[in-house]
Amino acid sequence: HPLALATGAEEEIIIPDHTLYGVYPPKIAEDEIKPVNESGEIVLSRVVVPQTIVVHDGVPSNASAKNYYVPYRDYIKNVASSEIYATWPQSTIVANVLAIMSFTLNRVYTEWYRNQGYDFTITSSTAFDHKWIFGRNIYESISVVVDDIFDSYLSRPGVKQPILTQYCDGRRVTCPGWMTQWGSCDLGERGYSPIEILRYFYGDSIYINNAEQIAGIPASWPGYDLTIGTSGDKVRQLQEQLDAISGIYTAIPGVVPDGIYGNATAQAVREF
């Protein structure tokens, strides 16, 4: 469908198939709890809800795929609208939204892709993460649920990080130990509550937790201050964020993400 741009022109957006009937690669299995390096550099100091998610619209290795800066709630609503049906029971929608949010906040907390040298939070590939579709419509029943519980995630006793709650459709793909989307619909129709649905698939130790809210895009402190002359991935990450923000707030000068903290970067920081 056409999407209005700031210039007044329209861009033609092709919306691909929903994941429950389209053909997409199945999720590559991962451990639901990520190891923490002894240095502690892999994770943030606490679980937070970011204001913005940086979505890489492709597989991680596709350097030509675009990165989109998406408000967290809008991202979750988009993924849920792409992964499940809005006509399913509310308890099913809540359970699936919780799983989507917990998975996403695990990527945020562990800085999973940034620790691999990438400059994004999560991908739109179903093989690695969830399906996010640029420009798609959002369903009201899903939007209401996300607005109600957006600061929640799933935990296990003694585990600080949000659980990487993986799932599959349960018909074309089977995934023992994960939630199946069609199975969650069936349980919802049988009167199961959201936590009962989640415990049916992920086990009785799973529980719902709440995160702090935070503005911006969370990133762990690199162990040193970023000043004139500093270089590296953390500087490049800062520059990319400033450059994206400058497209909206024109008082902030654009910067080239070269990984070197020079005068142009310092000026952009001062304006910010």
Language model features by range: what are they?
Residues 1-272:
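Conserved, single-site charged/polar hotspot
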